[in-house]
Amino acid sequence: MSPLKAVAVLTGADVKGVVQFT
C-alpha cells in the first residue's frame, strides 16, 4: 500500500468516526 493511500484510508476512517460521533 502506498503511503498516500494509507493516509487517505486513515483520514477517511477519522472523518467517518467524527461524523458518527457527532
Curated annotation (Swiss-Prot):
Gene Ontology cellular component annotations, sorted alphabetically: cytoplasm
Assembly information from the UniProt record: Homodimer.
Record family assignment: Belongs to the Cu-Zn superoxide dismutase family.
Known tissue expression: Dominant isozyme in roots.
Name under which the protein is recorded: Superoxide dismutase [Cu-Zn] 2
UniProt source species: Picea abies (Norway spruce)
One Gene Ontology term of the molecular function aspect: metal ion binding
Keywords (A to Z) from UniProt: Antioxidant, Copper, Cytoplasm, Metal-binding, Oxidoreductase, Zinc
Reactions the enzyme catalyzes: 2 superoxide + 2 H(+) = H2O2 + O2
Task of the protein: Destroys radicals which are normally produced within the cells and which are toxic to biological systems.
Note on cofactor: Binds 1 copper ion per subunit. Binds 1 zinc ion per subunit.
Compartment list: Cytoplasm
Chief localisation class: cytoplasm
EC number: 1.15.1.1
Cofactors, names only: Cu cation; Zn(2+)
